[in-house]
Each structure stands twice: as structure tokens, then as C-alpha cells.
Amino acid sequence: MAEHPRQLQDPAHQPRSHQVVKAATAATAGGSLLVPSGLILAGTVIALTLATPLFVIFSPVLVPAVITVSLIIMGFLASGGFGVAAVTVLSWIYRYVTGRHPPGADQLDHARMKLASKAREMKDRAEQFGQQHVTGSQGS
């Protein structure tokens, strides 16, 4: 019983019949997947061979049509993406204004307070500079 798990771990110590069964199973699975793969490849080559003259004949129509359709699709996707972003932002703002505390509200409040304190600090510095400038020009 102790030898059985060891046999499963080391393929060199497995019986020859197990190795043959594994090889046969692998060959069967590989072959059964290789046949449809080859058929699909052959079908693709045949379809491309038949369609190439049509592509060449209709390319003055197809190329602009593909470009136009691509631009239309990209426009709709971009429009939808921006619409989703706008709805998300408006929803976040609504939750923030109503006090529901959306994700990131703490960071926004912290940044707002930091900005307000810097603005006050700059205002005080400007007032000090203005007073120094006024007193300096009066003394001259």
C-alpha cells in the first residue's frame, strides 16, 4: 500500500502496461483533436481562396464600408463608456452630497481641508507681504 502512491509519482517505476495505456490515450486524444483542426484549416484555405477574388473586386466598396462601420462602432462604444462614467460620477456626487459617504469621500475631505489651509496660509503671507511693502514704502 505504501508503494502505490510512490508509483504514481515516479513514472519510471510504473508498470509498462500503465505507460502504454497513457501513451495510447494521449495519442487518441491528440489525434481526435488534430483531425478537426486540419479540417478547419483546409476549409479556411478553401474559403479564403474562393473569397479573395471577391475581396479584390469589391475592395473599393468594402474598405470604406469597414472603416465607416468601425468608426460608428467606436463612436457608440465611446459614447456608452462616457455615459456610464457620467452616471457613475453623478451617482457618487449625489451620495456625497446626501451624506451617504461614498468610497473616496475621506480622501476628498482631506484634500479639501489641506487646500483650504494652504489657501489661508497664502492669504496670510500675502497680507504680511502687503503690510511690509506698505510700511517699507512709507518709511522711504
From Swiss-Prot:
The chain crosses the membrane at residues 31-51, 75-95. Expressed in seeds. It comes from the Eukaryota. GO terms for biological process: lipid storage; post-embryonic development; reproductive structure development; sexual reproduction. One of its GO terms (cellular component) is membrane. It is a multi-pass membrane protein. It holds the Pfam family Oleosin. Keywords: Allergen, Lipid droplet, Membrane, Transmembrane, Transmembrane helix. The keyword Heme does not apply. The keyword Chloroplast does not apply. It is found in: Lipid droplet; Membrane. May have a structural role to stabilize the lipid body during desiccation of the seed by preventing coalescence of the oil. Probably interacts with both lipid and phospholipid moieties of lipid bodies. May also provide recognition signals for specific lipase anchorage in lipolysis during seedling growth. Belongs to the oleosin family. This is Oleosin Cor a 13. It comes from Corylus avellana.
